[in-house]
Design a protein with these regions (language model features):
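Short, surface-exposed "cap/lid" segments of acyl-processing enzymes
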Residues: 1-27, 32
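Active-site loop/turn elements of alpha/beta-hydrolase fold enzymes
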Residues: 28, 33-37, 106
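Catalytic nucleophile-loop/oxyanion-hole region of alpha/beta-hydrolase
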Residues: 35-51
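Serine-dependent carboxylesterase/thioesterase catalytic core
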Residues: 46-175
Length: 175
């Protein structure tokens, strides 16, 4: 959560800072959800979000609040939030009590990574894993180093496979 607050402070947005980290007259409760496994199936993370929304609604009822929820989903979180809200709408026993859903930069029509990049990633992993060098680290744009198995794990993650329009398996076959 420290990283979340730090990113708010670094945002240079006075309004955003007032809403989230400063004591002002603006009266909002912000519930920030960070997934233990963000690359798990979108549906599974949506079910977790449904539980969070139910918890929030229970707390609001105890406090006597009638304010509806505002749900913001960023990137893949937009897909998770959309799925959770629609799933709750489809269940007549559940009420998400949400007046506004904001989707920011979410790949609602799928994500596209050029096939050449996917093939290259798989090829590099396969070439180096099959050599006596073992698992080496590859620097990625100043963000540190990632092991080759990390590249494989990311490309094989359930959510990545759900979002990608085209994908390449470990043998280089399109899926």
């Amino acid at each position: 959560i420290f990283g979340f607050f730090q990113s708010i402070e670094d945002s240079d947005s006075q309004l955003f800072q007032d809403l989230t980290i400063r004591d002002t007259d603006i009266d909002y409760d912000i519930v920030y959800v960070n997934w233990d496994n963000g690359t798990d199936y979108i549906q599974r993370n949506a079910y977790v979000l449904e539980e969070v929304i139910k918890w929030v609604n229970e707390r609001k009822a105890v406090a006597g609040s009638t304010e509806p929820n505002v749900v913001l989903g960023q990137s893949m979180g937009g897909l998770v939030a959309r799925y959770a809200l629609k799933d709750m709408e489809n269940d007549t026993d559940l009420n998400h009590d949400t007046s506004l859903y904001i989707s920011h930069d979410a790949p609602h029509q799928g994500a596209h990574i050029p096939l050449g990049i996917l093939h290259m990633g798989r090829h590099i992993v396969n070439e180096f894993i099959q050599t006596p060098l073992g698992n080496i680290n590859i620097p990625i744009n100043g963000t540190g180093s990632y092991g080759l198995s990390t590249i494989d794990d990311i490309l094989d993650a359930p959510a990545v496979n759900q979002m990608l329009i085209n994908n390449v398996d470990t043998n280089g076959n399109r899926t």
